[in-house]
Amino acid sequence: MNLRTSSTLLSLLILTVPIMASNFYPYTKKSYPIYVKTMVSYAFLVSLIPTMIFIQSGQETMISNWHWMTIQTLKLSLSFKLDYFSMILMPVALSVTWSIMEFSMWYMHSDPYINRFFKYLLLFLITMMLLVTANNLFQLFIGWEGVGIMSFLLIGWWYGRTDANTAALQAILYNRIGDVGFLVAMAWFLFNLNTWELQQIFTLNPTNTNLPLTGLLLAATGKSAQFGLHPWLPSAMEGPTPVSALLHSSTMVVAGIFLLIRFYPLTESNKTIQTMMLCLGAITTLFTAICALTQNDIKKIVAFSTSSQLGLMMVTVGINQPHLAFLHICTHAFFKAMLFLCSGSIIHSLNDEQDIRKMGGLYKSLPFTTTALITGSLALTGMPFLTGFYSKDLIIESINTSYTNAWALFITLIATSLTAVYSTRIIYFALLGQPRFPTLILINEDIPLLINPIKRLLVGSIFAGFFISNNITPTTIPQMTMPTYLKTTAMLVTLLGFIVALELNTATQNLKLTPPSNYLKFSNLLGYFPTIMHRLQPLTSLLTSQKVASMLLDLAWLENALPKSISIFQMKTSTLISSQKGQIKLYFLSFLITLTLSLIMLNFT
């Protein structure tokens, strides 16, 4: 009992430390960013204690002691669920946020509103903690909307840029589509079960849950950038690099997958929803991997790799391995945040240059960043004994031994091999070869605020997967036996991707530039999806509206139906009842002929 009580108190302390940091320290002081970063680091260190206690004892805790309100028969209370998912994800999110905040002090040092930027990052962290620990749908929805509005503010941080404003609006609008599904699910649970508490929902175990789970899947599709609602994720790269690292590594984008993992007691008995998740995740992971192959913006390549990994997590939930998907969330956070920070280091060093075609040869001038970027890329591809290997290898093994849907699983394996291709492309273009940037650029990475956060994430990218997978037992039963060739598939697929990428890069190095093929255009223009959705569809609807307004209303009704029809009717009526036909030329001609004949006759007489 004492162990559980101390664990609970420490967990609550973690949640309150960032809030105390934002409230008790003067917001206008120059030292505010340092204070916030220090508080988050303390919160991370404190969070390790209850996590270790939980690992040793395995006791879940639920705190529900503050009553909010009672609406007819529904009682709403503030309740926290400190279980496997929240206790493991909290230290991961706090450690990544700590590193990103320290990196932001270097990256955003010249920004006049850096204090406000840190305030936004802190609020984002608080809402994410609320989402992770929520025990009822209403509280979870508050955290869900909180991360949504904070992402809007952070993506549109450089509000003087049109692209940043458009990207922020795009993010909020696509997420609103997903929120409709969340609200439908909340309404269904309230109407049918009269509760929003997760334990009660899982205990009641309703039978026909297709509608609420489809709503939750739509919500996850919007938040986790699955196919159809994915364009906001690459567009969100218009925000500062620390924002990209925080939102698109460990926190906001995985919230949708986390929601589905939370509801796994309902999804594991619903084969329809599992198949939908599997197919949606497979399409997402392949499509975004293809899009990443031909991008030239270094941040967009990393963003598409995030979307591809989210598709892989969705596939994992779809084959009924939610705890494996959660493990991939935790491992993915470290190396993906590090990849973004390395990209930020390169971009900042090259005077805001993001095009990989204008980089090259950086392994000499940025040796530490090069080491971290290569390690992160190898971890992303699932290189053995790096962090990504411990989750990705298990996922591919589970896919190979699953009999759910061979088509979806096959294209997921293709997407996994493409991961190695675009990772090799970043290394090849940005770090190796000859420098392709101006010689006057001053590069200096010997700055503690830059080195230390990447160093911590580098350690996490190497060892975190080992520690997490060794200390946590899988609660979803894994495949116990499999043939040797299936066991080695994950490594073989990755190696195949590396070999293909290196061969293609070497073979095409000295080729003449040819007009791009349709396949390259399809990949480079993101499958024409933004063009169709953001340009063609609005243009078609606007042109249709214009035609209806001008042709149907103005021309047909206001012009043809009334004034012109009246004038035509009057003309026809007057022509019909009048003896004069209005042929004035004929009248003049007959008059002239008559006059001429009369004159001739007078002359002869």
Swiss-Prot record:
UniProt KW Transmembrane keyword: yes
Location relative to the cell: Mitochondrion inner membrane
Pfam families reported in the protein's UniProt record: NADH5_C, Proton_antipo_M, Proton_antipo_N
MF GO annotations: NADH dehydrogenase (ubiquinone) activity
One GO location term (cellular component): mitochondrial inner membrane
Keywords: Electron transport, Membrane, Mitochondrion, Mitochondrion inner membrane, NAD, Respiratory chain, Translocase, Transmembrane, Transmembrane helix, Transport, Ubiquinone
Ranges that cross the membrane: 8-28, 34-54, 87-107, 117-137, 140-160, 171-191, 241-261, 273-293, 301-321, 324-344, 366-386, 409-429, 457-477, 482-502, 584-604
Reaction(s) this enzyme catalyzes, per UniProt: a ubiquinone + NADH + 5 H(+)(in) = a ubiquinol + NAD(+) + 4 H(+)(out)
Xref: InterPro entries: NADH_DH_su5_C, NADHpl_OxRdtase_5_subgr, ND/Mrp_TM, NU5C-like, Proton_antipo_N
Record membrane topology: Multi-pass membrane protein
Its EC number(s): 7.1.1.2
Annotated GO biological process: electron transport coupled proton transport; mitochondrial electron transport, NADH to ubiquinone; mitochondrial respiratory chain complex I assembly
NCBIfam families in alphabetical order: NDH_I_L (TIGR01974)
Subunit structure: Core subunit of respiratory chain NADH dehydrogenase (Complex I) which is composed of 45 different subunits.
Role according to the record: Core subunit of the mitochondrial membrane respiratory chain NADH dehydrogenase (Complex I) which catalyzes electron transfer from NADH through the respiratory chain, using ubiquinone as an electron acceptor. Essential for the catalytic activity and assembly of complex I.
Family membership: Belongs to the complex I subunit 5 family.
Name of the protein in question: NADH-ubiquinone oxidoreductase chain 5
Organism: Rousettus amplexicaudatus
Gene from which the chain derives: MT-ND5
